[in-house]
Amino acid sequence: MKVVKLADVVEFNPEKLKKVSLFDTDNFFCDIYCLEPAQSQKVHSHGDSDKVYYVLKGSGKVTVGSDEKVLGPDENTIAPAGEDHGVVNHTQNKLVMLGFMAPKP
């Protein structure tokens, strides 16, 4: 059984969002996203996969479809398959969040 301590994998890149794979199977993946201030994940979509964003630390503007909301620690949302989605760290603090996706694209 694979066990991951999140504190051991949080890593930032001053140039762009840092994404680290935590779990990756044929059907599912979970990544940790680490964003410095002003970094973002561009808005995009996955035709057949649902994606969940879960904020661990900091806050960020999350876009799903035509909605944009600020999510903070312990808040989450889902981007259903085919919906545009993305995130931007609009604050002066670091943002750490999980991204879950299934089925894997």
What are the functions of these language-model segments?
Residues D67-A81:
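Short acidic-glycine-tyrosine-enriched beta hairpin
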